[in-house]
């Protein structure tokens, strides 16, 4: 039987597994395509899975990706979770057990590190200070090319400097345990900072209050907050399957 894997969780979070060594149904949560969710015991861990067929593989789309995230979010309400990538499957019980066994120490360490933690996600949009600095002069083709190169390099440095300053400001405001930040220029000419913060789950309300304060302090920024989420950005994977 082929298994579709959603995430790894702590076995002791599920009373259904206390007296069983075989996969047990998890009630109240449905998987991809309405398939039954099972708790697959593996030492001190449990793998959240559902049965998977060749027909299911042909139906993997954006809706299935949303269902994948939904199942992980539901399990996150019950346990620390280590999410699998969308589309992770195992051909049979033995393959699943081997994968968990070979990564046991890594998975266990991550569960310990992320227990009681949650991820908050911030999107911050600001005007790009470099968006309208183009100069209009009479240059030869060669001069124009070199000038464009210099201006492009200057704009990139200024953009990076502004992104660093803003990310430092965000760090000081929210004081996360860890963070992952990406920055890119949008088609509109504005700059987008995509920020993932790892925090203690018990401080979510405090974090939300800080967000409310930040939206009033940073008038030149458009901010959007989501979470708490499973710690997607903070699970360090060392194998293709997990």
Question: Which ranges hold each PLM region?
Answer:
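An interfacial alpha-helical scaffold signature
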Residues: 1-242
């Amino acid at each position: 039987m082929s298994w579709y894997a959603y995430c790894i969780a702590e076995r002791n979070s599920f009373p259904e597994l206390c007296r069983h060594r075989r996969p047990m149904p998890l009630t109240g949560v449905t998987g991809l395509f309405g398939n039954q969710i099972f708790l697959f015991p593996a030492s001190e861990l449990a793998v959240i899975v559902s049965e998977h067929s060749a027909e299911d593989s042909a139906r993997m789309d954006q809706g299935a990706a949303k269902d994948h995230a939904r199942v992980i979010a539901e399990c996150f309400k019950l346990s620390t979770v280590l999410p699998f990538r969308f589309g992770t499957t195992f051909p049979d019980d033995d393959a699943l057990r081997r994968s968990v066994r070979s990564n046991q120490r890594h998975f266990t360490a991550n569960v310990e590190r992320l227990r009681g933690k949650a991820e908050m996600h911030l999107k911050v949009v600001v005007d790009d200070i470099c968006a309208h600095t183009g100069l209009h002069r009479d240059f030869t083709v060669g001069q124009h090319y070199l000038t464009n190169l210099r201006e492009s390099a200057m704009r990139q440095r200024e953009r990076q400097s502004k992104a660093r300053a803003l990310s430092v400001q965000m760090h000081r405001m929210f004081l996360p345990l860890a963070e992952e930040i990406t920055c890119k220029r949008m088609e509109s000419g504005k700059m987008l900072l995509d920020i993932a913060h790892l925090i203690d789950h018990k401080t979510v309300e405090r974090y939300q209050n800080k967000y409310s304060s930040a939206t009033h302090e940073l008038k030149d920024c458009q901010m959007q907050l989501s979470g708490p989420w499973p710690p997607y950005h903070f699970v360090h994977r060392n194998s293709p399957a997990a």
